[in-house]
């Protein structure tokens, strides 16, 4: 029987990933009062064939840790491996004492998907990766709904590109329509009239989701697409274009990454309401990258929201990106830097036209930074 002895610490991903990578028959969780709830998050994700036991120790008592590990060795037979990626230094020292005494194996998992074998200090890449749903579950959160970006409809992408061109060619008309939607419709499509004629000759028509915009009877934007109003008025056109570029980048990787769009989370088990928390979610192997897409004005509250979402659903090792269609004020750029939020935004309004196509290059840069 293969046994894996796991020293639990505050971070849970390396613990679960070590189990997934090696597939032991029995897992021995060595935890403290502060970490004794972590196995409850891990166990539902494990195959039913994997057995487990839980042991309690003090975080700074190396002797007790050594005694527990020796008890495990004496009461069981088979192969023993220790995951020493987490826990306090004294817990690790207590475990290492038993590793040496019984000539067991021990390993450490690094943030860049490497296994360090502690007996030889040799490194090798892990063979498994963590999926989005696993990382979210391990953070103690619950997915309600998401759309896989690999299933993005070409019609949505084309319509979003047309909306972008309309905004760049007719900024005043776009501002007028968005102001009407914000003030008179309270940013809810349910309140959007079937048509509206403005005093300057600007007019729109919408039916069953399609959208047509005219100026003095000259067509400015024609979208017979059933999702057009949703894309234009709610700003989802920018989210769609960003998600498409992230998808393009992912498909070029040797191991394509998961890309989700419009991710809904359930706040907790008692509260069944859902909230659209994440525009685009990228699984950069062991880390989640949360991408907030802003097609309009960006406030300081938006930046705080991005930071809070990252902390709630991804933890310390995740990253956040603010992808803005418009340039960002200097004070907001500084705030992003202070909170370690990557910023994807044009420096000037003129750069907006082709700026979206530079996102894959930035993802190359950020992806490398994530594993340092």
Regions found by a protein language model. Give the residues of each.
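N-terminal beta-strand-loop-alpha-helix module at the start
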Residues: 1-41
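Structural motif
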Residues: 3, 6-10, 26, 31-34, 79-81, 84-86, 264-265, 287-289, ...
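Short beta->alpha junction loops
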Residues: 7, 53-65, 294-297, 325
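Short, aromatic/basic amphipathic alpha-helical patches
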Residues: 18-20, 38-48, 95, 330-340
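A broadly used, surface-exposed interaction patch
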Residues: 26-85, 91-104
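Mixed-charge intrinsically disordered linker/loop segments at interdomain junctions
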Residues: 92-162
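Intrinsically disordered, low-complexity Ser/Thr/Pro/Gly-rich regulatory segments
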Residues: 136-372
């Amino acid at each position: 029987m293969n046994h894996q002895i796991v020293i639990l610490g505050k971070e849970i991903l390396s613990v679960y990933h070590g189990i997934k990578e090696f597939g032991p028959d029995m897992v021995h969780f060595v935890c403290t009062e502060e970490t004794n709830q972590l196995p409850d998050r891990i166990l539902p994700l494990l195959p039913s064939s994997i057995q487990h036991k839980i042991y309690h120790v003090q975080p700074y008592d190396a002797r007790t840790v050594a005694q527990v590990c020796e008890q495990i060795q004496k009461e069981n037979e088979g192969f023993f491996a220790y995951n020493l990626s987490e826990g306090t230094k004294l817990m690790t020292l207590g475990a290492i004492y038993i590793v040496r005494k019984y000539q067991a194996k021990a390993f450490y998992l690094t943030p860049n998907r490497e296994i360090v074998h502690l007996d030889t200090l040799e490194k090798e890449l892990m063979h498994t990766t963590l999926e989005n749903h696993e990382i979210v579950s391990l953070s103690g959160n619950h997915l309600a709904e998401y759309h896989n970006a690999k299933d993005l409809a070409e019609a949505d992408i084309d319509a979003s590109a047309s909306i972008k061109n309309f905004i760049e060619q007719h900024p005043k008309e776009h501002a007028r329509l968005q102001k009407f939607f914000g003030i008179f419709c309270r940013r809810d499509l349910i309140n959007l009239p079937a048509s509206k004629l403005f005093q300057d000759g600007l007019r729109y028509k919408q039916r069953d989701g399609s959208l047509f915009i005219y100026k003095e009877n000259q067509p400015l934007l024609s979208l017979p697409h059933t999702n057009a109003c949703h894309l234009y008025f709610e700003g989802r056109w920018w989210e769609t274009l960003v998600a498409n570029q992230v998808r393009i980048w992912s498909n070029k990787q040797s191991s394509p990454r998961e890309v989700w769009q419009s991710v809904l989370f359930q706040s907790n088990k008692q509260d069944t309401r859902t909230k659209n928390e994440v525009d685009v979610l990228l699984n950069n192997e062991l880390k989640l990258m949360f991408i907030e897409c802003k097609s309009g004005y960006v406030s300081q509250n938006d930046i705080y929201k991005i930071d809070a979402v990252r902390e709630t659903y991804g933890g310390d090792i995740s990253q956040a990106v603010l992808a803005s269609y418009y340039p960002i004020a200097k004070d907001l750029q500084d705030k992003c830097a202070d909170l370690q939020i990557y910023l994807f935004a044009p420096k000037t309004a003129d750069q907006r036209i082709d700026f979206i196509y530079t996102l894959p290059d930035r993802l190359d840069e950020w992806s490398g930074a994530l594993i340092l």
